[in-house]
């Protein structure tokens, strides 16, 4: 096995790497720092002012491990490996530009996201007409209206990222093709109207690890028949869903 001998700057400190153990320690420190970020800190990562940065072959702008804006992507666009944040409104174009788009955005059908991604900003994909996108398990934060009005998205079963902790207001509002939603055990906060008017939605699973659920997350979901919850958590969820108690069904996650 080749020797390791080098230096890395981490949080303003120069650290020497002489062994696999040194490398593992630094990776663990990085993982811990991102896991420990609060909802507000994750949001702030996506809300910074646009700095100078590098553009890729499509003219899409990157800086500080963030994707800031998508300018002229083609049918399929792969977000650069190592990108940790998709900035607010990066893929967004307004309601009245649909079918025309801004500098080619209307042509993106497939979007590939890297496993390094931890935060998706406010309105990052709103009104986008992509057909396919998969959310990597590394994503911890999905901002307000991030996927709102993405009614061209061919997603029927939405399995949310394993590391997802925070979901913003109206994050998936009007995503009319989603039929089922599965949250994983790291989820802490689901803000209000997250799935409002997802008219094809039939059921959702939410584990008892959730600490806060805003009002009306399933308002307008006219086909919703079941809200599946963890075994033994009915009392907890009756507080979250006082008007939908009849839809609450305790179930083992392995059976959905």
Where do the language-model regions lie?
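Short linear proline/tyrosine/threonine-rich motifs used for host-factor recruitment
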Residues: 6-9, 14-17, 33-34
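Mature extracytoplasmic/luminal segments of secretory-pathway proteins
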Residues: 15, 55-57, 147, 152, ...
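Acidic-aromatic substrate-binding/catalytic surfaces of carbohydrate-active enzymes
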Residues: 92
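Consensus positions within tandem repeat domains that build extended binding/scaffold surfaces
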Residues: 89, 121-124, 143-146, 168-171, ...
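Structural signature of tandem-repeat unit edges
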Residues: 2, 12, 35-61, 65-85, ...
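Residue-level detector of alpha-helical secondary structure
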Residues: 18-20, 24-31, 46
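DNA-binding interface regions
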Residues: 241
């Amino acid at each position: 096995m080749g020797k390791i001998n080098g230096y890395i700057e981490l949080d303003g400190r120069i650290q020497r790497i002489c062994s696999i153990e040194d490398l593992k320690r630094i990776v663990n420190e990085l993982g811990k720092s991102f896991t420990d970020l609060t909802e507000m800190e994750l949001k702030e990562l996506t809300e910074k002012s646009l700095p100078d940065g590098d553009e890729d072959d499509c003219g899409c702008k990157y800086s500080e491990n963030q994707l800031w804006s998508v300018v002229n992507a083609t049918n399929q666009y792969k977000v650069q490996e190592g990108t940790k944040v998709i900035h607010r409104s990066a893929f967004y174009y307004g309601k009245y530009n649909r079918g025309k788009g801004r500098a080619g955005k209307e042509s993106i059908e497939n979007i590939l996201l890297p496993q390094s991604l931890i935060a998706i900003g406010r309105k990052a994909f709103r009104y986008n007409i992509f057909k396919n996108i998969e959310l990597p398990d590394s994503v911890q934060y999905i901002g307000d209206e991030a996927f709102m009005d993405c009614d061209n998205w061919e997603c029927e079963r939405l399995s949310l990222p394993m590391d997802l902790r925070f979901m913003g207001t109206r994050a998936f509002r009007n995503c009319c093709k989603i039929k089922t939603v599965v949250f994983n055990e790291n989820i802490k906060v689901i803000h209000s109207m997250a799935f409002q008017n997802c008219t094809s939605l039939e059921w959702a699973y939410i584990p008892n690890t959730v600490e806060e659920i805003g009002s009306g997350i399933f308002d307008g979901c006219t086909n919703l028949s079941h809200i599946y919850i963890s075994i033994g958590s009915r009392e907890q969820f009756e507080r979250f869903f006082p008007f939908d108690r009849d839809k609450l069904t305790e179930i083992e996650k392995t059976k959905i």
